[in-house]
Amino acid sequence: VKREIIEKYGGWKFFLLTEDIQFTVKNIIDGEKIGYCKNAILFDEQPVTFKQSWSQRLRWSRGYIQVALKYGAALLKGTFVKFDYSCYDMTMNIMPLSIIGITSIVTNIIGLILIAIMSPENLVPAAWIVGKMIFGLYMSFFVFGFITMVTAWKKIYCNPVRKIFSLFTFPLFMFTYMPIIVASLFKKVEWKQIDHT
């Protein structure tokens, strides 16, 4: 980040739960060029426990909602009026997981409840369809993980057995985002220190 960018805003003025995403979105809306750097190396520390991971992802989910509420209209305007690809890219980054995830959960639960009440004999076939959808989602996450693993194999620093094992557990990890997204709508979420590796 250029110093001039920070000075333009009069210092760091980004304090939502995902301040890095907020900063990026604000710059895109203001017309700054944000780009992909193929050779960039990201050093990321991971939470030590699943509970800490849950807390971190709860904060991220709530932060994405905050950013969507604050900047969503401007991003949509940039996408559909100015045809700005960067606005589209960030819209797809911040909105789909929460909106599609919550819509999917609510729709499936309501659908199963209505079927159970109005047509109990169709509950098993309906549950079977939902099960197939869940399996399809699992396979989608598996394929995304596989593509990532193949393209970044040498940059993932763990033994090959663990890499392969993670292909099968990654979709399960991603499934835990569904209750996190729902919880982020109702639970008061604040920033707190997360121990990392």
What would you call each of these model-derived segments?
Residues 59, 97, 170-173:
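DHp/HisKA dimerization-phosphoacceptor four-helix bundle of two-component histidine kinases
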Residues 96-104, 137-139:
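Select subsegments of transmembrane alpha-helices in polytopic membrane proteins
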Residues 101-119:
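Hydrophobic, aromatic-rich transmembrane alpha-helices
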Residues 67, 108, 178-181:
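Amphipathic, well-ordered alpha-helical segments in soluble domains
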Residues 73-90, 113-197:
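Juxtamembrane C-terminal module of membrane proteins
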Residues 4, 40, 112-113, 180:
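Alpha-helix/helix-capping structural signal
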Residues 89, 93-97:
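Internal, well-ordered alpha-helical scaffold/interface segments
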Residues 1-83, 95:
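Non-transmembrane catalytic domains and loops of membrane-associated enzymes and transporters
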